Amino acid sequence: MLLFDASAIANLVIRRGRNALALTKGNFALDLTGYEAGNALWRLCALERKITHEEAEAFLLTVAGFLGLLRLVSLAEIDLKRILSLAVSKRLTFYDSSYIAAAEAKRLTLVTDDEALAKVAEDYVETETSNEV
């Protein structure tokens, strides 16, 4: 089973559109992932101007559909001390460390397109990119 991070979800939706929804069955995301994916789309639209406002809205609706089909893991389900320990020892954000801790605790493969996160995560859990799923 898979745990998708925001970078993977955003890239899957941009590349595959609604076809990305097929990847959701029995898989997971963190409850904060929607906010992160929305922020990534905002960055692509408002700051980098790589997509239009209309494209960002369409992608956001697909992201919401994608997340609505995934099993969401809340912060209350993850060992907070483990997250903080990873964040401090590996110099990752608390957000990024939460993906590793959740994948570790639930024995999931972490799907991420964040190279820095993947490099650290591969010492703890199986990892894949969105191109590999």
Question: Could you describe each region identified by the protein language model?
Answer:
Residues 34, 38, 56, 60, ...:
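A general structural signal for well-ordered alpha-helical segments in protein cores
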Residues 39-46, 104-105:
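Short glycine/serine- and small hydrophobic-enriched flexible loop segments
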Residues 68-116:
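Active-site neighborhoods of divalent-metal-dependent phosphate/nucleic-acid chemistry enzymes
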Residues 1-34, 49-58:
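Short, well-structured N-terminal submotif of metal-dependent ribonuclease cores
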Residues 7, 38, 115:
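Anionic group-transfer/hydrolysis microenvironments
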Residues 12, 36, 82, 119-120:
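Phosphate- and divalent-cation-binding pockets in alpha/beta enzyme and binding domains
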Residues 30, 34, 100-133:
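Acidic, PIN/NYN-like endoribonuclease modules and their adjacent C-terminal/linker elements
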